[in-house]
Amino acid sequence: MVESPVISKWVRDSLEIMDIRAEQSGLPFVTHRLTPETDNTFWVNLLGRGYPFPRKKLRWCTDRLKIQPVNKFVKEQIAEHGEIILVIGTRKAESARRAKTMAYYEKKRVRELLSPSSTMANELVFSPLEDWTDDDVWIFLMQYRNPWGYSNTDLLTLYRGATADNECPLMVEKGLPSCGKSRFGCWVCTMVEKDKSMEAMIANDDEKAWMTPLLEFRNRFGDETNDRGRRSFRKMKGNLQGTYKQLHHGPYLKYWREKWLEELLEIQKDINENGPEEFANLELITIPELRCIRRIWVFDKHEFEDSLPGIYKKVTGKKFDDPEWVGSEAFRKEEWDILEEVVNEAVNDLYSGEEMLFEMVYSLIDIENQATSLNKRKGITESLENCIRKTFYKNEEDATQYYMDRVIRKKDLGGKYNSLALDGRYDYLNEENEDEDEKFYLKSSSRNQYNDFKEIDYA
């Protein structure tokens, strides 16, 4: 997955020991490590579907990677037991926003110390540490032994290593930072400009220098300056949206999805071979995720070249294991290369500037090929028409002009239109991600606050 490998290992080892100690002590404790569905992981969305890297106005990751797995597990427990009490370590001292939220639900308590859940019925929330400070937490951990025998000192060392000065002052001066200010999250997180915790861990400990490629890779794909040019000028479903003479770009292009996958596999291989022994089997991306990405590329994006197995073999030297794969027998990489050559010749000789022609042709061929049997012919005409609508533009300039003309036509006819597209004073960069893709990315979300999110066509 995408948690910091060091923290992930610490958690796995701790949970394993917890299970062992619980069984030895005859205690009814069972640990569950929650993970997202394979179809909803970070890499499947970023590299498979081409979702833009998460940012403040397009934060698709938290719901899919954290909230949905937790909600699914909680619902299963409520279905089995009727009611549950969720014990969590949230504290008011973590942030002003957290304190405000906790104070709000504190007023709604149905029983002493038990707050109602903000999203689920029959779930009560108990926060025993709600009034603890960072220092309270560390003093407790250093004074009391871990009940399942795991080292709290090792945990302190982890947090100390993640601070810029490699120190963790406890109750010395109010102005000094505590270890609790270090934040451990996903190593791929692009919600912040810099991953200061990982930078500090690498700077403070030579033995963690093996994580440097992870940090550098995160900075490369999270480069907002060059991000727009790496993405299609169309949205995820092929529609256009924009502001004054500018289109809002959508998913990542094929080249970048393949390039980043290859880089990720190379980093994984390097860590396995040259990193610490305990990370010799580290998986930055799993085989099930790779299989899911392969199916999205071939069946959803019509990239019948089927490049993933080749990328995998190039990096690892091994054949890609996918026993349930059933691909096309008629169209593969050889046919893809021939088609690309023919289309490029046509563009050079007859259709100058037709940048979308190759995508239109290979998509139409693949759509027809996927519907060869009679039971799959239903809706084939509509699918072909939709494909043509997505790719009939000559290039981005042509698509932009088409979009602007359409907005003007809607205005002239008295229809609903995107007024921002006609406002030359509007800075599209400030609102680029408040668009239909955000609704598309969140449409399948299980969070209650997104259930009533309706899609509006402004253009």
Task: Kindly label every feature range from the protein language model.
Residues M1-A459:
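Nucleotide-activated chemistry modules centered on ATP-dependent adenylation/adenylyltransferase
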